[in-house]
Amino acid sequence: MLILSGRVYCGAFPKFLYHQYNLQLVDLSHIQIKEGFPSWLLHNNTKLEFLYLINNSLSGPLQLPLYFHTNLSNLDISDNCFQGYIAPMIGTYLPRVRYVNMSGNGFRGSIPSSFGNMSLLQTLDLSNNKLSGSIPEYLTIGCISLVELILSNNSLQGQIFSRTFNLRFLGELQLDGNQFTGSIPHSLFNCTFLRVLDLSHNDISGKIPWWLGDMSYLEILDLSMNNISGNLPSNFCHTNIQKLYLSRNGLQGSLKDAFYGCFELIVLDLSHNNVTGSIPPWIGKFSQLSYLILGHNNIEAKIPIQLCNLTQLSLIDLSHNHLSGPILPCLRSTSNSYRQQDGSYNASAPVSMDEPLEFTTKSISYSYQGSMLSYFSGIDLSCNHLTGRIPTEIGNLNEIHVLNLSHNSLTGEIPASFSNLHQIESLDLSYNNLKGSIPSQLTELNFLAVFNVSYNNLSGKIPDVKQFATFDESSYRGNLFLYGCPLMKNCTEISLPPSKSRTSIENKESSCFIDKDAFHASFGVTYIMVLLVIAAVLYINPYWRQVWFYYIEVSTNNCYYFIIDNLAFLSKFRFCNFCK
């Protein structure tokens, strides 16, 4: 056994390794080896069972040993710089391998059919390479023990599987980020133990097959970014499914019967489809739901009161629909990490999310995934037909990061309770019918990076302190009675008719001048602090103190001799003032 993972920086294989012949486990991961694949290591150590070379700088082709190696069980060469083709006979030379991970390299060409000779293979990960062609039929027939097949982010194409399919124990199938076409193969129905099915970011067409709802072990289904069409299947869910990603397809129909019974759902993403009808009341039974993404559809009617029963919600995106009525004052949005700290976090909910979710933040659509989602929360109700006042209770969402209520018909004033949104980074209330002034309490929102109240009926002076001094004119335009920086107009300009506004025009920038007293005070404090820091450094460090006084002495002597040698010249042109 030899384990040097992450302990030393080698650059090359240790020389003593060339003289080892009875090793069973070798782990040389994370030590930046910059050579080729050590086929000699397999040739010298016929009893070797585990070989881990993860995250190095190994390059060149994958060279097989000279003879069959029947004892190797685990081979992991992920996250290196290997290139070229995967050896066509790899399955013949390594017939008893159970785990193969070659992800994160530069392999190209087709997947060798000889993988089908690995009858004991349980995990095959070839993701994040440059592989092309189709999935070999012999692989789907011969790898009878395969549990995980991960081919994500390559250039594979064609039909996913042929009819001759024998992967009955398959539990995880990830084919996302390729160019597969055709429909979802019926042969997957035989994978009764399938837990994860990710076919996203392909060119798959057709309808969602009804039998996917009968796969009782299925927990994660990702069909997003395809060309799937047709109505949402009715009675689709079994109780085990937790994450459902169907965004950016051509799905249509009503939600009424589609997902009833999916009571363990944590993620429901149906954004960018043609879903119609209303949000059904039974959604309030999804007690585990954390991410509800229904934006960019044709959903109408009011927001159901049952949404208030969902205490685990982190992200709510109902934007770009036809929702009407008031905003529910009981809506919730809290990050998973906050619920965990608060003691109300559900242990069954995931700490991190592997699949990305799109959410608009700071006017830009971002993809969030992994642990980032656990620390993120937001509500987006923009681009609907919502009416009424903004509930003051929304200000109680003190852990929310994004709130977007723009492009509705909301009335009333901006609630002063928004000053409690201590973690908010983006607040968009633009294109409504809000009136009154901008509450001065909002200047206490220290993390606010994007603020937009444009095209309302707001009035009064714009706050010009703290982060509000950084927002530009686009945040406030379209409000006739707002004045101050950065709109470059004051209250006098608003009260006078245009023909008599010369005085206000001449003074329109007066509110934008820098306070000179504050500038002088801050400059003086900064200057004193710099002197104190220099004095502290010289006091603490004897070496620098000695260097400092030596430098002063040398400078004084130079100045003295300069004056003596050039006294006449300096007197004539009065350069004595220059030395002061």
Can you describe what each PLM-predicted range is?
Residues T492-K580:
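Terminal membrane/secretory targeting segments in land-plant proteins
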